[in-house]
Amino acid sequence: GGYDRKRDLEDAMLCAAPGMKKNGFLRLGGGEFSLPYTVICGCHPRKTVLITAAVHGGEYVGIQAAVELADKLKPEKIHGRVILVKTVCRKEFEERSGSICPEDEKNLNRVFPGNPQGTRMDRLAYEVVQKLHSAADYYIDLHSGDDYEQLTPYIYYAGCADEDVVQMSRKMAEQADVPYMVKSNVASGGSYNYAAACGIPSVLIERGQMGGWSPEEVHSTRKDVRNILCALGVYDGMRS
């Protein structure tokens, strides 16, 4: 009847045994997209936090922070589940094409919620919504400045959503050690904006610039994420 083996397989990829960590490639869109990911399941059931990097393929601070978080977060300290997708725009990252997909000349973070019948970025956005947003209770999206962007570290929080979602998004943003906090005023286009409009408290961290990264920037982003996880009760520990 309604048995969908492919969908069941995709759902199973986002699960691990309690107290375990699983690494692999998440196949989306019938195999069109293959995204490196880690899922860490704690021993205690609670909420799921989705963390994504490389929604823009040339923003390296978030990628390296996600790689290190996947390595350093300890399953025994997790209450719930953490899903880390280390490179959403994997092909664009590998081809060093920055924030624009050469195939359709679209910016992934402008086309959410996507369209399964659209061009490449439309299809990827649709798959992210269907398979990743749908699994999340909270969402942290990691960005930095592309090779033409200078910026001071800051954090966006969702502003166009139900009031309880906005307030929780702001609470998440307050955990980040950045000079500026910005309330978003759009409900679609961006991955985290659309997730929030669907009821998922969401933030976007910006740190790093001009297509570069440093160990200090990566460490700061890791610390911000850890502090958000602690504030959500998903990770054991004190604010650092």
Each language-model region and where it sits:
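Structured catalytic-domain cores with a bias toward divalent-metal coordination
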Residues: 1-240
